[in-house]
Amino acid sequence: MLQFTLSYIKSLTKNLSIISPLPPPKPIKQNHQTKPAMNNFQPPPPSEMPDYNGLLGTDDIGGFRYGIGVSIGVLLLITTITLTSYYCTRNQLSSSPSQTNQDSTRIHHHHHHVIIDVVPGLDEDTIQSYPKILYSEAKGPTTASCCAICLGDYKGKHLLRQLPDCNHLFHLKCIDTWLRLNPTCPVCRTSPLPTPLSTPLAEVVPLASSVAATRMS
C-alpha cells in the first residue's frame, strides 16, 4: 500500500514537470488606429431652430405687407400735394408784383383826381385878372415890406400882385405860382375870388363860369 502511494506521487510529479509554466502577461501596446476613431467623434446635433414662419401665420404676413404698401402710398400723396402747392404759390407770387403795380397806379390816379377836384388851383385867366401894382405906388404905413412867400424884401420897381378882398401884396411870380396850386391867400387863407362889390358884374360872370368849369373837369 505504501509502495502504491509512492508510485502515484512520482507519476504525478512527472506530469507536473511536463506542464510548462504560463508565460508572463505582455504589456498592452497602444493601437494608433484607434485615434482616428476618436477624432471622428461627432457631437450630438444641436437643437433645431424655432420656425418663425410657424409663429407668424400667413394672415399676419399679408397684413404686414398691406400696411407697408399703405404707408408708401400716403407718403407719395403728401409729397405730390406739397409740390403742387409750392408751384401754385410760386406762380401767384411771380404774377403779384405786376398786379400790385397796376393797383397802386389806379389808386394813385384816383387819389390825384380827388385832390384836383377837392382842392383845385385857380386857372390862368383868373390869376391874370387880379390887379398888378408897383411897390413904390402901393407903399404905405400898413404895407408889408417883404413877400410872405419868398421872404424877399420889396423894392420900389418890384411888380406886385394884389389879391381882392384881403388886399395882400406879393411878388408877381411868387403869387402866380402859389395860386396855380392853391385857391386861397397864403397869409389869411381866404379865397381870392373877386366879389361883386370890388369887380364889375361883367367880369364876375365869366370868372364864376370858368371856376365852375374847372371844378367839373
UniProtKB/Swiss-Prot annotation:
Gene for this chain: ATL70
Group of enzyme by EC: transferase
Transmembrane residue ranges: 61-81
Pathway assignment: Protein modification; protein ubiquitination
One CC-aspect GO term: membrane
Superkingdom assignment: Eukaryota
Source species taxonomy: Eukaryota, Viridiplantae, Streptophyta, Embryophyta, Tracheophyta
GO biological process: protein ubiquitination
A Pfam entry, by short name: zf-RING_2
Membrane-topology annotation of the record: Single-pass membrane protein
GO molecular function, one term: zinc ion binding
Localisation per UniProt entry: Membrane
Disulphide bridges, residue numbers: none
Reactions listed under catalytic activity: S-ubiquitinyl-[E2 ubiquitin-conjugating enzyme]-L-cysteine + [acceptor protein]-L-lysine = [E2 ubiquitin-conjugating enzyme]-L-cysteine + N(6)-ubiquitinyl-[acceptor protein]-L-lysine
Protein's UniProt name: RING-H2 finger protein ATL70
Gene3D superfamilies assigned to the protein according to its UniProt record, in alphabetical order: Zinc/RING finger domain, C3HC4 (zinc finger)
Family: Belongs to the RING-type zinc finger family. ATL subfamily.
Zinc finger (RING-type): 147-189
